[in-house]
C-alpha cells in the first residue's frame, strides 16, 4: 500500500467534489491503490468518496459487481475494481473505499483498496497506454508520470461495458 497518504477520503471536502467549475478540474485526477498499483480517474467524474459499507448482493450481476448500496436514499450499483481487473478478491478493511462516479446520469460506485490523493497531472506527462491484447477493453486511457511513480489513468465510463451498464443501472449507455 501507499507509504505516504497525502489525502484521506474524509479529508476531501464535499465542496471539492460537488460540481465545481470544470476548468478547475482539467488535468486533476483522484488517485487510488488497487492490488498494489496506483490508478487515477478524472476528478470531474467523481461525485463523492465513502467508506466501505454493507453491499446487498444482486443475482445475475456481472462477476465484478458486488451488488448495490443505499447511499442517502439512492440505490447505487458497486463494482470491485480488483475483480474487474482480473485480480484476486481481497478482504475489505478500514482503508477500503467506494468512489461514487456519474456515468450517463447514473451513479456507479467503484470499490478500491485505498484512496491516495487528488493530483494535477499535466498533459505532457501523460503517455498513451501500452497496447495489450484482450484485457483492459480500453478503460486504461493513459499512463501518468509523477516523479518516481506511474499512475494508470482509467476512464470510468469504459470500465463497464454497454450491456453490463444497462444491467446494473437499467439505462442504456
Where are the language model's segments positioned?
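An acidic, low-aromatic, low-complexity terminal/linker signal
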Residues: 1-173
Amino acid at each position: 500500500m501507499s507509504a505516504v497518504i497525502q489525502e484521506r477520503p474524509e479529508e476531501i471536502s464535499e465542496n471539492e467534489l460537488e460540481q465545481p467549475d470544470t476548468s478547475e478540474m482539467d488535468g486533476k485526477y483522484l488517485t487510488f491503490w488497487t492490488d498494489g498499483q496506483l490508478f487515477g480517474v478524472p476528478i470531474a467524474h467523481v461525485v463523492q468518496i465513502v467508506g466501505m459499507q454493507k453491499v446487498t448482493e444482486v443475482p445475475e450481476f456481472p462477476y465484478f459487481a458486488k451488488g448495490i448500496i443505499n447511499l442517502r436514499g439512492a440505490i447505487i450499483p458497486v463494482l470491485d475494481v480488483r475483480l474487474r481487473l482480473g485480480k484476486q478478491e481481497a478482504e475489505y478493511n478500514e482503508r477500503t473505499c467506494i468512489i461514487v462516479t456519474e456515468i450517463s446520469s447514473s451513479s456507479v460506485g467503484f470499490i478500491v483498496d485505498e484512496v491516495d490523493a487528488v493530483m494535477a497531472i499535466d498533459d505532457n506527462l501523460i503517455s498513451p497506454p501500452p497496447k495489450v491484447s484482450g484485457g483492459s477493453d480500453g478503460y486504461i486511457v493513459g499512463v501518468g508520470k509523477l516523479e518516481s511513480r506511474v499512475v494508470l489513468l482509467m476512464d470510468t465510463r469504459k470500465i463497464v461495458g454497454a450491456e453490463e451498464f444497462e444491467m446494473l443501472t437499467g439505462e442504456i449507455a
